[in-house]
């Protein structure tokens, strides 16, 4: 339905424009029908409570459409608005009112004959919007005539004028219906455009949201990029430091490789030295074992030598005692010899006269001696004669009629003891005395310092009395006076004395095994 031209700039237009601006701000475009229904609800709800009584709405529609309460359509609308039948207490909100009114208008359009009523209702609604809210005159049917409504009361006498005006109104109504259809089509196109615009706006809003999200994401990416730049700078610095450290580590590694090579060379030398030391230690161990065995043998030999030395010490002590006894005996014999020398010196003067008788007596004494002693004496005399013939000048000297003094006698005793004959089967004197034999130069030098020399048992034979007689080859050192006038008994006494000294001074050789240590080279330090 079109609004009058004079009312285009009125409060209704302003309210409509304001509602449109508010709807645009909310993003919702309303149709003309919804605008009329909203204006009807707002006219019935001046306090803006959001709920309106059903009776109030029905009274307003009755006043606008000119229908009575008995109208079937209004009763249907009342039943739709008050399905529970609450009566005057029934209320309805805007959403329910809009839904019920849309359904009611659709049902009336299907039944037909609602165009005039709608036009009248729309004109009344638009006219009622110009009135102040809450005006009681709007609800009064008597005052509807002044606002463009019709009085349902019976017509007055000016019927002809009313019919003519009614025809004019019908013509204008038809004209306005065509214009209304055009406007509805334009409204539909506008609604379609607004729907498209809404879709575009929603798409733009979505795009704006996506753009904002992309912008926020870009900002986040930018911040992350800045962080990555700072991180890259720090990583570059770390890379530089790591490169420097790597170069330093490489130099250190080269130095360590050189040190390792030197250490390997030293290790090889040390291994060679260790092998040499090991071999040397093995050699020393073997030498140590050999020396241990030698030491054990030497200790054993030393023990045996100690036993031998103790035995020899005891034997030497016994010989010392015997020697003292012999010395005492020889002292007594020397005294007797000196006494006899004095007697001989006294009787020397009368010896010339009795030389012949002495010769005879001497021959007799010689015959009386044992055969061995006689042979000895004859050998001595022959040797003395040979010495006198060999040394005539010495024979001219005065023959000593005295025996040697005490020193010469001691030397003679020692000489006789040394020159005593031994049995041809006896061992070497060095074996008895314990002297080491000289090593032959052909023998190879041995590595050992001490070599035990163990000799076998030496069979010793006791001297026979027949062998202890004066042997002519070993008695050349005996000093006997060459005076031919010595009495034979005195000479025999002297010979017996010498024989007793020789027999008593002879010591038996040892009969135990002879042990000896022979140094073949200087002992080790």
From Swiss-Prot:
InterPro entries in UniProt: KASH5 (IPR028170), KASH5_coiled-coil (IPR028168), KASH5_EF-hand-like_dom (IPR039508)
Mark out the compositionally biased spans (Basic and acidic residues). Answer: 385-408
Q: How does it sit in the membrane?
A: Single-pass type IV membrane protein
Q: Where is this chain primarily localised?
A: nucleus
Please give the residue ranges the record annotates as the region Disordered: 127-156, 384-409, 423-444
Kindly state one GO CC term assigned in the UniProt record: chromosome, telomeric region
Q: Where in the cell is it found?
A: Nucleus outer membrane; Nucleus; Chromosome, Telomere; Nucleus envelope
Annotated coiled-coil positions are 164-360
The species this protein belongs to is Bos taurus
Q: What is the lineage of its organism?
A: Eukaryota, Metazoa, Chordata, Craniata, Vertebrata
Instruction: Recite the UniProt keywords alphabetically.
Output: Chromosome, Coiled coil, Meiosis, Membrane, Nucleus, Telomere, Transmembrane, Transmembrane helix
Protein's name according to its UniProt entry: Protein KASH5
MF-aspect GO terms: dynein complex binding
Describe its assembly.
Core component the LINC complex which is composed of inner nuclear membrane SUN domain-containing proteins coupled to outer nuclear membrane KASH domain-containing nesprins. SUN and KASH domain-containing proteins seem to bind each other promiscuously; however, differentially expression of LINC complex constituents is giving rise to specific assemblies. At least SUN1/2-containing core LINC complexes are proposed to be hexameric composed of three protomers of each KASH and SUN domain-containing protein.
Q: One GO biological process from the UniProt record?
A: actin filament organization
Q: Where are the transmembrane segments?
A: 484-504
Per the record, the domain comment is: The C-terminal 22 AA is required and sufficient for localization to telomeres at the nuclear envelope.
Cytoplasmic face: residue ranges? 1-483
